[in-house]
Amino acid sequence: MEAIAKHNFARISPQKARLVADQIRGKSVDQALELLTFSNKKAAELVKKVLESAIANAEHNEGADIDDLRVAKIFVDEGPVMKRIMPRAKGRADRILKRSSHITVVVADR
């Protein structure tokens, strides 16, 4: 039994979000939620919301017991990039890349 939750177009760099995702992969949902709650990273808050959604999906749609769930898969894919221009000295300009992510969490029974 698996339950999936996604957050598409999350406004965070995939590189930064993967740091948090790698920490909770394979852990029980209780451990993962605890770890995310006390993390200072912006990505931790976003991943926590997706994880809570996946847990709710498992409970509501599959009738799963929360105590038996673990983070089976979690991955962060690259979303679209917004390109912006930053004016610089002497008429030049730099490109600013505002990256986004697609966060996917899959929870399953042990």
From Swiss-Prot:
This is Large ribosomal subunit protein uL22. Belongs to the universal ribosomal protein uL22 family. One of its GO terms (cellular component) is cytosolic large ribosomal subunit. One of its GO terms (biological process) is translation. GO terms for molecular function: rRNA binding; structural constituent of ribosome. Keywords: Ribonucleoprotein, Ribosomal protein, RNA-binding, rRNA-binding. Part of the 50S ribosomal subunit. Pfam families: Ribosomal_L22 (PF00237). InterPro entries: Ribosomal_uL22, Ribosomal_uL22_bac/chlpt-type, Ribosomal_uL22_bac/org-type, Ribosomal_uL22_CS, Ribosomal_uL22_sf. This protein binds specifically to 23S rRNA; its binding is stimulated by other ribosomal proteins, e.g. L4, L17, and L20. It is important during the early stages of 50S assembly. It makes multiple contacts with different domains of the 23S rRNA in the assembled 50S subunit and ribosome.
